[in-house]
């Protein structure tokens, strides 16, 4: 189904307002300035044109996975060239550790995990050869967990998590990973980082790990999560001292750990930002906090997102700002185009504001 012309026209009208930030975005990696970027949005030609209309000039990409060898350099170079034909910089991708390499973290089995880590390291080398200098990944056992969607302004459908709505028998049910204690989880993370980060450092690729989403009580579905509080995040950074070891810093996932995210988010930004360990930012707001929240539009949630972006600027963060999850609505011709356009415009405006251009 094509996007109605009125919708295209509305987006085109906003293009001039985004152009100043867009021009700066294309040079941001050399002028030390934040820029809007997206990782979740699609990559068809039509979708890349939509990003152009929204003032987005940086995008992450996914690549075909080839059994036994991971990524193919030619695939990466072709996609990079295609992005550039739309005025987009392809400067980030995701290592599919959770999706493709179950023995590294999920099962923690040797010698299978050694073979998988070798392939992960080769994928890092391939990314570097293609000129991609940032990769995100995660070391979770449990995937993102949500309860029923909840309605927001104008009929937007937002994801939510309400622990008290999940029956205790569901919370106690083990995955096929079995019981994973905190000690077991840390051992698997340590094992991966010891082998992966030196390769990333050699090939100058920043590796940003994600926090666990959402925070859950110890033993939830048999797993003790270790990256859903401040102490766990600090411990993770200390495992490897390297300028290429850091965070995919998800403001929303961190807020999910907190009782008062409106105030408690700033020590996280100061601590990890001052240590230059924030490599990419997911700019997602929410209403609520630990064990009970609904995701929200950037100016609707509990956190003041101007202050959040200003805090990131003040610690010297200069990479991408990504809207992360966005809500959907029934009358959107593409289900999520309206919310992405809203978030891209908001981020571009906030970037202008924190640099004194508003």
Kindly label every feature range from the protein language model.
Residues 2-37, 47-52, 104-106, 118, ...:
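Histidine-acidic metal/acid-base catalytic patches
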Residues 7-9, 41, 45, 110, ...:
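An N-terminal assembly and electron-transfer interface module characteristic of large anaerobic redox
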Residues 29-69, 74-76, 82-86, 90-95, ...:
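Ligand-binding pocket scaffold of soluble enzyme catalytic domains
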Residues 44, 72, 181, 302-304:
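A diffuse structural propensity rather than consistent per-protein peaks
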Residues 56, 96-98, 212-214, 284-288:
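Short connector loops/turns at beta-strand edges and beta->alpha or beta->beta junctions
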Residues 63-190, 194, 201-202, 253, ...:
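Structural motif corresponding to the early beta-alpha repeats
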Residues 137-142, 211-213, 325-326:
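Short, well-ordered beta-to-alpha junction loops that form the rim of enzyme active sites
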Residues 169-185, 211-222, 256, 329-331:
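Active-site-proximal beta-alpha loop/turn segments in soluble metabolic enzymes
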């Amino acid at each position: 189904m094509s996007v109605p012309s009125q919708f295209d026209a509305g987006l085109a009208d906003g293009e001039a307002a985004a152009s100043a930030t867009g021009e700066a975005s294309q040079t941001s990696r050399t002028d030390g300035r934040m820029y809007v970027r997206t990782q979740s949005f699609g990559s068809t030609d039509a979708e890349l044109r939509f990003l152009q209309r929204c003032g987005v000039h940086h995008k992450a990409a996914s690549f075909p996975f080839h059994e036994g060898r991971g990524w193919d350099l030619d695939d990466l170079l072709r996609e990079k060239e295609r992005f550039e034909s739309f005025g987009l910089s392809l400067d980030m991708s995701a290592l599919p550790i959770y999706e493709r390499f179950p023995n590294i973290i999920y099962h923690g089995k040797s010698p299978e995990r050694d073979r998988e880590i070798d392939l992960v390291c080769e994928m890092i080398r391939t990314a570097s050869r293609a000129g991609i200098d940032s990769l995100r990944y995660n070391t979770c056992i449990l995937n993102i967990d949500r309860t029923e969607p909840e309605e927001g302004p104008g009929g937007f459908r937002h994801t939510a998590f309400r622990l008290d709505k999940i029956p205790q028998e569901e919370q106690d049910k083990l995955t096929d990973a079995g019981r994973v204690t905190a000690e077991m989880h840390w051992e698997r993370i340590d094992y991966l980082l010891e082998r992966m980060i030196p390769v990333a450092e050699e090939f100058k690729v920043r590796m940003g790990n994600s926090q666990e989403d959402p925070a859950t009580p110890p033993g939830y579905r048999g797993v003790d999560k270790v990256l859903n509080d401040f102490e766990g995040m600090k411990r993770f950074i200390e495992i490897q001292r390297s300028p290429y070891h850091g965070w995919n810093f998800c403001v929303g996932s961190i807020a999910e750990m907190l009782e008062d995210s409106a105030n408690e988010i700033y020590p996280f930004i100061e601590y990890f930002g001052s240590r230059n360990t924030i490599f990419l930012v997911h700019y997602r707001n929410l209403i609520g906090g630990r064990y009970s929240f609904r995701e929200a539009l950037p100016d609707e949630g509990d956190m003041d997102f101007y202050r959040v972006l200003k805090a990131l600027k003040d610690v010297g963060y200069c990479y991408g700002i990504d809207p992360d999850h966005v809500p959907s609505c029934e009358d959107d011709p593409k289900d999520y185009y309206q919310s992405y356009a809203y978030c891209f415009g908001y981020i571009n405006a906030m970037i202008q504001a924190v640099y004194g251009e508003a």
